[in-house]
Amino acid sequence: MKKLLLVNGPNLNRLGVREVNVYGKGTLATLETDMKHEAEKMGVELECFQSNHEGAIIDRLHEAEDIYEGIILNPGAFTHYSYAIRDAIASISIPVIEVHISNIHQRESFRHESVTAAVCAGQIVGFGFYGYKLALFALMEKLREA
């Protein structure tokens, strides 16, 4: 059975209470449960991880290469400035799909640039929680192509 990793970055533990007009009312627990269920339907095991700490995310990305076949990553605000996370993604050989709940290109100008997207297999933005499912579908297709 394929194993995938879902990584959510800073402040995503606050889903459901943080800026519901931007991120919706769904919680991280709901998102993770829904994603695990979707993965199961595809015959895939999905492990979920969330951290507000850059180093913890980097460590998890490094460890993932030996455990998982691919990663779905929402780096949160680290998207816009974490060259360390960018370099961690670039250093691993498994595909990473970047996902964002909101359309980062329609928000504040500082959110328009992703320093991580260039080293990811793709980026999905603006589809709410459904974007994570799209990322799962895209990642599975990427793995089939390999």
Swiss-Prot record:
Keyword check for Protease: no
Enzyme nomenclature, EC number: 4.2.1.10
Residues binding substrate, per UniProt: N74, H80, D87, I101, S102, R111
CDD domains: DHQase_II
Assembly mode: Homododecamer.
Family: Belongs to the type-II 3-dehydroquinase family.
Protein's UniProt name: 3-dehydroquinate dehydratase
Species: Bacillus mycoides (strain KBAB4)
Gene name linked to the record: aroQ
